[in-house]
From Swiss-Prot:
Family under the similarity heading: Belongs to the UPF0178 family.
Organism per entry: Escherichia coli (strain ATCC 8739 / DSM 1576 / NBRC 3972 / NCIMB 8545 / WDCM 00012 / Crooks)
Name under which the protein is recorded: UPF0178 protein YaiI
InterPro entries: UPF0178
Pfam family, one: DUF188
Length: 154
């Protein structure tokens, strides 16, 4: 079981939460990016550098993730592919993607892409708030408790 991070777009405050969680959970954490990353020394944390290019990091995460893994990403198509493989997916704001919600999210993403392509300014997401950080940490903890229950450790 591994936590995979779409690290190029992941906010540093979320990475910090993940570093601490990897140590506490003693769970492998892999940050996938197309640039060098500095991470704290740990036997649980590693980086995987991929070539620059559209969706290269996403494709590598999809290739390597397995059922039971966790993928941290704001990229909806990546989350959809991870869910298809049986992994869980959480975005940096603490929202868990599920098979029930991912189709709706993909449809909304495609709609927003169409608006942008037609010249309509849609704006980006708000900056990450303290509430978002707390929601992320809470959802990560919830996922970890589910893992422990499934292993019979609770």
């Amino acid at each position: 079981m591994t936590i995979w991070v779409d690290a190029d777009a992941c906010p540093n405050v979320i990475k910090e939460i993940l570093y601490r969680a990897a140590e506490r959970m003693q769970m492998p954490l892999v940050l996938v990016a197309n640039q060098s990353l500095r991470v704290p020394p740990s036997r649980f944390i590693r980086t995987l550098r991929v070539a620059a290019g559209f969706d290269v990091a996403d494709n590598e995460i999809v290739r390597q993730c397995e059922a039971g893994d966790l993928v941290i990403t704001a990229d909806i198509p990546l989350a959809a592919e991870a869910i298809e493989k049986g992994a869980a997916a959480i975005n940096p704001r603490g929202e868990r993607y599920t098979p029930a919600t991912i189709r709706e999210r993909l449809t909304m993403r495609d709609f927003m892409d169409t608006l942008r392509a037609s010249g309509i300014q849609t704006g980006g997401p708000d900056s990450l708030s303290q509430r978002d950080r707390q929601a992320f940490a809470a959802e990560l903890e919830k996922w970890w408790l589910e893992v422990q229950r499934s292993r019979g450790q609770m």
